């Protein structure tokens, strides 16, 4: 094969390599994006309480028991989809669920909780994504499992339903609560 024929194959080889990478990337599950925060202390924050703007909440609320920190917004259809499951988890499993209201307005967020119920022990209010950036939030819903020492143990991107709870979230929560998954 002469030199000009070899040169002509270079763009084809590059194209095939890029196509293979694209095909591989399309097969990955976007919900399984690893978080650099897993197994590290939850980021510091100082945010107002959604219901009581005069109360400031800090990372200290995460210390003492295992928590699900659920990033949500009233404008998020998937958040409304998972809301009933979060209510069930809080009621039936006694898991502390902390809301992280993200890029929302206070009136709309409060209206959603009034309409659908409030599964949250407390809700952080982050309308400007000040803390969301530190937590690596890029969409809602997202849920973090934080152990009693304030260490992030798992991040879930996307809504939680009964199957996700039973197969993914609950076993991790049980492990850090001292039970067996």
UniProtKB/Swiss-Prot annotation:
It is found in: Cell inner membrane. Residues 36-178 form the Thioredoxin domain. One of its GO terms (cellular component) is plasma membrane. The chain crosses the membrane at residues 7-26. Disulfide bonds join 76-79. Pfam families: Redoxin (PF08534). Its main location: membrane. GO terms for biological process: cytochrome complex assembly. GO terms for molecular function: disulfide oxidoreductase activity. Residues 27-181 are periplasmic. Keywords: Cell inner membrane, Cell membrane, Cytochrome c-type biogenesis, Disulfide bond, Membrane, Redox-active center, Transmembrane, Transmembrane helix. Belongs to the thioredoxin family. DsbE subfamily. PANTHER family: THIOL:DISULFIDE INTERCHANGE PROTEIN DSBE. Involved in disulfide bond formation. Catalyzes a late, reductive step in the assembly of periplasmic c-type cytochromes, probably the reduction of disulfide bonds of the apocytochrome c to allow covalent linkage with the heme. Possible subunit of a heme lyase. This is Thiol:disulfide interchange protein DsbE. It comes from Allochromatium vinosum (strain ATCC 17899 / DSM 180 / NBRC 103801 / NCIMB 10441 / D). The gene is dsbE.
